[in-house]
């Protein structure tokens, strides 16, 4: 029905129609005709240009090529953030000064040489390093082999904080890895209880907090329960997390006793209020006072892009820019009071509730009335 009537078709049939094969020439003509119609009739606030991850390589970059192609035609609604790290990449610049999730991680040789405890918090290195933003070379796996040998020899202890047994946990050996099977979405109570133990047992680094951090005195009253009457101790967290209180205290003591590398993944920050978890990872690392020391501190990108392999000095070719200096076919820049950029995961909200005002990254966003959504490199 849509092939015959386009935007005048019966939308009640949407999702029930059979697949109809057309030639590439027909498909491209239909796409451009609809692009023209929406741009001329409704303007840029009705067009969404969105991408997810990319195809491997710099030229076949879905997001860049789509942005360039649509920019040659006219303005559209863009997207901000990404599906991978939507919460962490917003909060961490305000906490540590950079996005952190895509930063270079401490090299594995330094970790293997200096770390005594590695905490995998929602991070499955073995599974996720199969993919890569560039062309995966899997060099990092040789360091996982070295880690496995050191774990088996008792030189490094690995603790996995995860509701499930991950591929990395299985690879390193169930008999060697300590599993903290936290209840889903209760990671922050566990973090608070660890922080409470570090503070109450005087295991935290006062000098590091005094010299390199700000705001601990604002965090402390909440941690101690001075405002709500509930100390965030291990006994409190046990009821929420499903983790025995003494296990929580023991974990805090172990992390403070020697050089501890916190390896945080991205999955936990995708839950509701996930930015609090990312923030608390930094709080714990700061209380331990090991940020900047070899084999200590925290990182959020160890499972990605061969992280931890020593960097190369060679030049990396940049990709094609999504912008263009060529004047577009249509120069309409009137978004009619709607936002020109929306969070990438909120396009469904824009379709269902156009005009709704939401908060995002400290700003108000007015969702536009979308009539056409153009996706490339996403599912």
Predicted ranges, named:
Residues 196, 201-234, 335:
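Scaffold signal of the M16-like zinc-metallopeptidase fold and its non-catalytic homologs
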Residues 43-44, 61, 243-244, 249, ...:
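Gly/Pro-rich turn-and-neighbor structural signature
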Residues 42-46, 204-209, 292-299:
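Flexible, glycine/charged-enriched surface loops at secondary-structure junctions
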Residues 50-58, 236-240, 265-273, 304-306, ...:
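Conserved short loop/turn motifs at secondary-structure junctions
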Residues 111-114, 118-124, 175, 219-241:
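Conserved thiamine diphosphate
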Residues 255-361, 366:
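A glycine-rich, hydrophobic/aromatic-adjacent loop/helix-cap motif
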Residues 1-203, 332-333, 347, 363, ...:
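N-terminal export/assembly segments and adjacent metallocofactor-ligating motifs
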Residues 247, 366-373:
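Long hydrophobic segments that form regular secondary structure
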